[in-house]
């Protein structure tokens, strides 16, 4: 997949923050578009993907790139709030009748009020343990696109990564249903404000006043175009870069 044809803002973030002598972690590696691109820019990449269908395709794609495969370490499990069993739901928060594993939408949070949503029991590892085991010396960047799982692994937990910097984080948020929207999004924002001094929009690389944008949302159910919530959603959905570095 050529850079520029798929989420070009992600590749721009990679070009800015990945370093040839540092490793990075790709959470939600899917079938590997960011993994292969990032491997060319970093010392090595730890690709984490708990969806068994996506992981099989990821493995094939990595093997098809012999010039990069030695720099790519594949992990067939997910990052969870704690180490142990992890339930992965086809379609995640946005399950529909056609959702299936491997379509990039699998997530730790199930869709509300959807009985019979397909579920896969995977292995989960907490972020602190993963860093200690696999990337404790040289990780400077984490990409996170885990279809709603951000609401489980960031709040109250990201602060534990202080001994690693914490690494710069590029996270794509996925809007939950209205009933949980404010509580989940605010919990993540508050944790990131505690951990990082600088925030940038992946879409245009501009600095953002994250706390101010969140405080401007008074009606979290207002989905009208241009509403404060929709502006925040657009920023978070396209990718938020949280870092201690200047862009």
Indicate residue ranges for each PLM-predicted region.
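Phosphate/nucleotide-binding beta-alpha loop and adjacent structural elements of enzyme active sites
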Residues: 1-247
């Amino acid at each position: 997949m050529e850079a520029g044809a798929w989420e070009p803002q992600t590749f721009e973030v990679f070009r800015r923050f990945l370093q040839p002598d540092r490793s990075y972690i790709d959470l939600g590696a899917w079938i590997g578009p960011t993994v292969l691109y990032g491997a060319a820019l970093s010392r090595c990449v730890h690709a984490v993907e708990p969806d068994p269908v996506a992981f099989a395709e990821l493995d094939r794609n990595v093997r098809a790139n012999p010039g990069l495969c030695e720099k790519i370490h594949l992990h067939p499990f997910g990052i969870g709030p704690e180490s142990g069993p992890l339930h992965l739901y086809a379609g995640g928060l946005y399950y529909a009748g056609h959702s299936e594993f491997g379509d990039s939408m699998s997530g730790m949070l199930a869709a509300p009020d959807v009985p019979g949503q397909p579920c896969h029991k995977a292995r989960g590892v907490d972020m602190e343990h993963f860093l200690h085991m696999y990337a404790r010396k040289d990780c400077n960047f984490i990409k996170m696109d885990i279809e709603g799982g951000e609401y489980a692994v960031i709040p109250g937990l990201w602060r534990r990564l202080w001994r690693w910097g914490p690494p710069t984080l590029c996270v794509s948020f996925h809007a939950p249903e209205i009933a949980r929207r404010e509580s989940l999004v605010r919990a993540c924002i508050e944790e990131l404000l505690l951990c990082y001094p600088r925030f940038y929009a992946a879409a245009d690389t501009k600095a953002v006043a994250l706390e101010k944008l969140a405080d401007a949302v008074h009606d979290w159910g207002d989905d009208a175009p241009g509403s404060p919530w929709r502006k925040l959603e657009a920023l978070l959905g396209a990718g938020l870069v949280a870092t201690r570095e200047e862009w």
